[in-house]
Amino acid sequence: MSKSILPKSPQLLEKKLGYVFQNQQLLLEALTHKSCKKQYNNERLEFLGDAVLDLLVGEYLFKKFPLAKEGELSKLRACIVNEKGFMKLAQSLDLGAYLYISQSEENNNGRQKASILSNAFEALIGAIYLESSLTYVQSIIYDLLEYNYIKIDLDSLFMDYKTALQEITQAFYGEIPTYTLISESGPDHKKSFEIALSVQGKEYARASGNSKKEAQQKSAQIAYKKLYSKMNKTHHKGEK
């Protein structure tokens, strides 16, 4: 049985955020998971934070990509405003270390669970908004997005590299890529899969992910960039 772990001091989190709560109870509420069975938890603040994040991420993308169409902006936002995207932002704050969770969740690696981290991040943003202002929350969100999505662009966030790669290999080699599972490791709640991608028996890429689908997409992205570059060089040679 795992030992109970005491959360880090909330004041350390405030220092990271650059924001000090006037109402410390509000901060504790944002950091308390429902599994604790206390009189308060972060579900209501999560509801509020979800709406705030949807607005501010949308505004951030609207300003960052002035030429992007509505459909492109919607896809970009959908790639950030989701459980995985919020987990990434939560991890950049080491938010899991500050959470109050039950012993059962502690035993099940709850501090690293995507759902718990994502919900807590939404709750934290909701709490800051409730106590301060939308403008103040905006500065925090913008900083987090700039830090975590340095190379954010219209292609890298939502391009389906598997489909794009398949189009190239069919045109060049007359066949689709082969994805082979090389290894599978880790406990059930935190699996890691390594996938090798080959075309006509030649390996072009290997990548790992928390799911086979993620590992396939990562390996497809690597192979796509290699073959796309090769395709362009061949095309330019043909023009000479």
Curated annotation (Swiss-Prot):
Coiled coil: none annotated. One of its GO terms (biological process) is regulation of gene expression. Residues 10-133 form the RNase III domain. InterPro entries: dsRBD_dom, RNase_III, RNase_III_dom, RNase_III_sf. It catalyses: Endonucleolytic cleavage to 5'-phosphomonoester. Its cofactor is Mg(2+). PROSITE patterns: DS_RBD, RNASE_3_1, RNASE_3_2. It is found in: Cytoplasm. Its main location: cytoplasm. Its EC number is 3.1.26.3. Mg(2+) binds at residues 46, 119, 122. The keyword rRNA-binding applies. Pfam families: dsrm, Ribonucleas_3_3. Keywords: Cytoplasm, Endonuclease, Hydrolase, Magnesium, Metal-binding, mRNA processing, Nuclease, RNA-binding, rRNA processing, rRNA-binding, tRNA processing. Residues 160-229 form the DRBM domain. The active site is at residues 50, 122. It comes from the Bacteria. The keyword rRNA processing applies. NCBIfam families: RNaseIII. Digests double-stranded RNA. Involved in the processing of primary rRNA transcript to yield the immediate precursors to the large and small rRNAs (23S and 16S). Processes some mRNAs, and tRNAs when they are encoded in the rRNA operon. Processes pre-crRNA and tracrRNA of type II CRISPR loci if present in the organism. Belongs to the ribonuclease III family. Homodimer. This is Ribonuclease 3. The gene is rnc.
